[in-house]
Amino acid sequence: MARVKRGVTTHARHKKILNLAKGYRGRAKSCYRIALQRVEKALQYAYRDRRNRKRDFRSLWIIRINAAAREHGLTYGRFMHGLALAGVDLNRKILAEMAVNYKDDFTKLAETVSSKLAENS
């Protein structure tokens, strides 16, 4: 049986971590043990924040829809309820896009919602 030395695999593993640590400050970019800690923490942050990003965007969309709805005398909750009554099936992302970039279309939508709410109450 031939003797197996692990220098090649160790070097490859260290190189992989140090490549991931490019751009870090101080010894975190050049010292394997410190780089390993920093890279592991960075990956934890990345995992967590991929989930938080979804929450943050939904929150941003709701804020934008609420601001646009209030310009037309409606609150966010009443606006969304009115959309459901009117049978409008648009998600928050599209509604926020309309509120920011297509104000005329959003105004028509708000008028539709207002008429449905008045008709229903």
Curated annotation (Swiss-Prot):
One of its GO terms (biological process) is translation. GO terms for molecular function: rRNA binding; structural constituent of ribosome. Keywords: Ribonucleoprotein, Ribosomal protein, RNA-binding, rRNA-binding. One of its GO terms (cellular component) is ribonucleoprotein complex. Gene3D superfamilies: 6.10.160.10, Ribosomal protein L20. Belongs to the bacterial ribosomal protein bL20 family. NCBIfam families: rplT_bact. Binds directly to 23S ribosomal RNA and is necessary for the in vitro assembly process of the 50S ribosomal subunit. It is not involved in the protein synthesizing functions of that subunit. This is Large ribosomal subunit protein bL20. The lineage of its organism: Bacteria, Pseudomonadati, Pseudomonadota, Alphaproteobacteria, Rickettsiales.
